[in-house]
């Protein structure tokens, strides 16, 4: 990558350009649920012991995958006027995946993007951006083939503010994305190794809002807060990516005590998220399993022993909330961490 300034029409602008290339090969040996299950008896009395399968006689599937990527990119940051900046750029991408029975190749994929920033005054600035999207992925369909890259476009507008001489910053953004080949769980279908199969959803749309504020709003008192809300749907209007919570809120604050206690900083926060769900295969067919909305609180304290050394204690999941971080994957649910305490000693050279 190279970056440098240049002058045109009496104004100073900036040019950036570069290139990348990667070549990846992988051999995957996959074994499904081919051995005979052994009864464990009463589940509540099970000790976890289970006889080891006869791996030598277990058949497997060998998949060879070869992925090649290359591309070049460039962008110009135009200084159109004192309060107005325009960024125009593009990326040219080549992508190829060869998996024996499956082959996909995309040559010279042109991906333009543009953005504009306008400084309304010394406090506020507004911006807008447009980006084309092309993201290779490794998800596989029920036949074991890698899904084609996700492609589409994203538009965003926002407003940023810098307050208290730049010590406190806030922003709000609205986004709208249209994507094709978005990986979705193919309920009831699995790969030979037992992992979930996926299908590519097309004509999808995702839109939402993000708010963020962080910085020192009073001497020694810092705040970090944010919230987001989005919707996502298929072309037919059905819910998309239900395993991702639609709304999240996070708040954390720290305060450095004044006077003789100035070496001590205390803080706390809370993270909240809305419900999420995912398909799982039950005895009577596919079902939706999920986790309701929940909040996790935390506390911290840090003491600066010297200008270079400090000791900190963090208490996570303060109220020992029991919750799931994932549901449905391999027809199972994973608990989040219970209440835990971590002590850290840090030293800066």
Indicate residue ranges for each PLM-predicted region:
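Repeated loop/turn-to-beta-strand initiation elements of outer-membrane beta-barrel proteins
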Residues: 10, 83-86, 122-126, 165-170, ...
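Gram-negative outer-membrane beta-barrel transporters
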Residues: 81-83, 176, 199-281, 319, ...
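Membrane-embedded beta-barrel scaffold of Gram-negative outer-membrane proteins
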Residues: 126, 150-216, 228
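Transmembrane beta-strands of outer-membrane beta-barrel pores
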Residues: 19-27, 92-96, 130-136, 163, ...
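Surface-exposed extracellular loop regions of Gram-negative outer-membrane beta-barrel proteins
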Residues: 1-5, 67-100, 109-135, 213-227
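Conserved C-terminal beta-signal and adjacent last beta-strands/turns
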Residues: 15, 242-349
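Residues on the lipid-exposed face of transmembrane beta-strands in outer-membrane beta-barrel proteins
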Residues: 2-4, 72-78, 114-118, 157-161, ...
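Face-selective signature of the C-terminal outer-membrane beta-barrel domain
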Residues: 1-100
């Amino acid at each position: 990558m190279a970056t440098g300034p240049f002058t045109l029409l009496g104004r100073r602008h900036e040019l950036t350009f570069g290139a990348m290339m990667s070549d990846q090969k992988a051999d995957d040996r996959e074994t499904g649920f081919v051995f005979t299950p052994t009864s464990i008896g009463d589940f509540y009395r099970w000790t976890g012991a289970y006889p080891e399968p006869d791996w030598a006689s277990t058949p497997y599937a060998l998949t060879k995958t070869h992925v090649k990527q290359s591309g070049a990119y460039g962008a110009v940051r135009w200084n159109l006027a004192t309060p107005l900046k325009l960024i125009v750029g593009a990326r040219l991408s080549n992508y190829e995946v060869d998996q024996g029975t499956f082959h996909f190749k995309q040559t010279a994929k042109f991906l333009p993007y543009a953005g504009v920033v306008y400084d309304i005054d010394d406090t506020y600035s507004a911006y807008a951006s447009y980006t084309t999207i092309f993201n290779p992925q490794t998800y596989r369909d029920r036949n074991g083939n890698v899904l084609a890259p996700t492609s589409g476009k994203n538009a965003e507008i926002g407003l940023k503010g810098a307050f208290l001489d730049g010590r406190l910053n806030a922003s709000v953004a609205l986004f709208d994305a249209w994507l094709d080949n978005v990986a979705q769980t193919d309920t009831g279908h699995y790969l030979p190794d037992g992992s979930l199969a996926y299908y590519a959803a097309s004509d999808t749309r995702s839109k939402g809002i993000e708010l963020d504020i962080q910085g020192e709003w009073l001497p020694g008192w810092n705040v970090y807060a944010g919230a987001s809300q989005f919707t996502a749907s298929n072309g037919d209007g059905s819910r998309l990516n239900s395993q991702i919570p639609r709304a999240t809120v996070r708040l954390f604050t720290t305060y450095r005590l004044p006077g003789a206690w100035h070496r001590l900083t205390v803080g706390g926060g809370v993270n909240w998220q809305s419900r999420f769900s995912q398909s799982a295969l039950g005895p009577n067919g596919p079902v939706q399993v999920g986790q309701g909305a929940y909040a996790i609180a935390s506390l911290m304290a840090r003491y600066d022993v010297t200008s270079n050394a400090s000791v900190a204690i963090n208490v996570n999941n303060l109220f020992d909330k029991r919750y799931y971080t994932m549901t449905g994957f391999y027809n199972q649910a994973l608990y989040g961490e219970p209440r835990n305490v971590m002590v850290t000693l840090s030293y800066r050279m």
